[in-house]
């Protein structure tokens, strides 16, 4: 089972924590991780694109000229696709790009990316993380204490308003509750900082 140092908020050592082998110690499956990232990114697409076809473009109800005798090609409407200002053929319509992968695949992906962070020594476990009031300066000091100077995802147990507000103005720092942890969020950040209570919640769901 993976063992990591447990850090206090001031960066000092608070002992060790043993992580669950089935969540943080599996052989990472990169293919599954990529599949889930693509699925989650697809779900974020708006899909509100829309063009008008010939029946939706305003006007064009009258036949431009008579069928025969003019020497010109026959035309039924000035809103036909071949006309300037006409409707679009097979253009984009509103749709959802979302698709779901099996639950087993999604679980394997989150376990794989968590195990990757452990293998790459990019997982930091905190004894706890609390702030009496929203203070960006204090949060920046906390990051300095634990030697984090890159994009970091901070996972806490439940909602923590002061922590979220303190980190809001810091570029590259995202705070989420343990229930919202996702493959895409973990992949977007270089380091994963997680509290001991959040580790227990994640293990409870995934183990």
UniProtKB/Swiss-Prot annotation:
Stretches the record annotates as Disordered: 47-78
GO cellular component labels: ribonucleoprotein complex; ribosome
Entry-linked InterPro entries: Ribosomal_uL4, Ribosomal_uL4-like, Ribosomal_uL4_dom_sf
Cytoplasm keyword on record: no
Pfam families listed in its UniProt record: Ribosomal_L4
Composition skew (Basic residues), residue ranges: 60-71
GO MF entry, a single one: structural constituent of ribosome
Ribonucleoprotein in keyword set: yes
GO biological process terms on file: translation
Keywords attached to this entry: Ribonucleoprotein, Ribosomal protein, RNA-binding, rRNA-binding
Function: One of the primary rRNA binding proteins, this protein initially binds near the 5'-end of the 23S rRNA. It is important during the early stages of 50S assembly. It makes multiple contacts with different domains of the 23S rRNA in the assembled 50S subunit and ribosome.
Family annotation (PANTHER family): 50S RIBOSOMAL PROTEIN L4, LARGE RIBOSOMAL SUBUNIT PROTEIN UL4M
Family: Belongs to the universal ribosomal protein uL4 family.
Quaternary organization: Part of the 50S ribosomal subunit.
Annotated protein name in UniProt: Large ribosomal subunit protein uL4
Source organism phylogeny: Bacteria, Bacillati, Bacillota, Bacilli, Bacillales
Gene name linked to the record: rplD
């Amino acid at each position: 089972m993976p063992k990591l140092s447990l850090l206090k908020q001031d960066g000092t050592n608070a002992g060790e924590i043993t992580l669950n082998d089935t969540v943080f110690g599996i052989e990472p499956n990169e293919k599954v991780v990529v599949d889930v990232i693509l699925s989650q990114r697809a779900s974020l697409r708006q899909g509100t694109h829309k063009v008008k076809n010939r029946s939706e473009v305003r006007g064009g109800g009258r036949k431009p000229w008579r069928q025969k005798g003019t020497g010109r090609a026959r035309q039924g409407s000035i809103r036909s696709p071949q006309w300037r200002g006409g409707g679009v053929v097979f253009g984009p319509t509103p749709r959802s790009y979302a698709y779901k992968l099996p639950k087993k695949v999604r679980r394997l992906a989150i376990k794989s990316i968590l195990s990757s962070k452990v293998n790459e020594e990019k997982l930091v476990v905190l004894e706890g993380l609390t702030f009496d009031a929203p203070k960006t300066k204090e949060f920046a000091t906390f990051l300095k204490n634990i030697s984090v100077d890159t994009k970091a995802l901070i996972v806490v147990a439940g909602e923590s308003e002061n922590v979220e507000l303190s980190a809001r103005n810091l570029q590259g720092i995202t705070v989420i509750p343990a229930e919202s942890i996702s493959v895409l969020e973990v992949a977007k950040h270089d380091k994963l900082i997680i509290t001991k209570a959040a580790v227990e919640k994640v293990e409870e769901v995934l183990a």
